[in-house]
Amino acid sequence: MAFNLKNFKVIVQMGKSRGDQSANGSTNGHAVSLKEGIQGFLQNAGVGNSSKFVLDEKVMAKLPSDFREQAEQFRHLGAYVSKLPVEEIGIPEYLGFVSRGSDTQQKRNLVYPVGGGVFIHVVHDPEDTRDYYLAVEPSLAPGVEEIVNDIDVQLMDYIDELRAADGSEERLEVILNAVDEICGRADSSSKKVSKSVDLTDDQFQAIKYLMRREKAGMGVMDPLVEDPYIEDISCSGVGPLYIEHKIFGGLKASIEFSDSEELDQYVIQLSEKIGRPVTIREPIVDSTLPDGSRINIVYGGDVSRRGSNFTIRKFSATPLSILDLIKFGTLTYEMAAYISLMLSEGMNTFVSGETAS
């Protein structure tokens, strides 16, 4: 298969809402995005012909020991790497930990973990100044999209338990326990399960991941929100999401909105997730995510020439100190001393600059 970086593109297919509702009250139209790029690439390369991931022993043997260990433990990563055109782009460098000194490659081709079985592949795009940022998720398991729809229907039988749950974490626990029962992975005599869903281990882990991502997380954007190295996520309209990365600078995500209808629908669903729904009467929303990140959402073309858009500005779990800023080259010791004097004297100050500068 000829390698084309555009094969990795993930078009966010919100799908047409069927008008039905999932067990947590949300519409099923966006429960699972159709990863036409990455998943299609894997399927066309042979991974999707079975119900489990296929690992290429020759490629696996070429991986460094730490990378191979991760690829064997997280089989979706192994399958992903197995189908990469390594003869053309080479074996990705595996970084167990990303630091300021990690950006050493002239043509980036590296993988790092962000937790929860999610890995990020940063790969050079010779046609653009921004390289690709690709999320390798457990949900790449073949055949899971149809299975999710079946499970969503059966989750309706657990509506009473979900209503009785106290808070989002308890609701997620109810959903995951229900999935265990539906998939025959729990010892239960429950009569709620009308038809047990038969899954491989790869598919089961993918389903559990998707349930966490879609029911409690940020959906298709969840890997970006969970990545501690991302400072800014922006969608300026139809087209790809853009990222400001703490280490690798400006990148473009493998998530793209192909038309304004898809984007409008996603913006509405995103605003509902944070409890501040946008409407025609209230098209602009400023809010915060559970982790403290700021989010700005603009809905529709009446208030924005490019239509709906949104920006997520993330915050570091550990705030940067003044010494960190000096180390990173943001300012000099003399500048830091001058700022200290201004603050001690109660002078008015302002700081300006572009995002992620």
What are the functions of these language-model segments?
Residues 235-236, 240-348:
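P-loop NTP-binding catalytic core
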Residues 354-355:
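The conserved Walker
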Residues 2-274:
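N-terminal accessory targeting/assembly segments
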Residues 351:
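Hydrophobic anchor at the beta1->P-loop junction of P-loop NTPases
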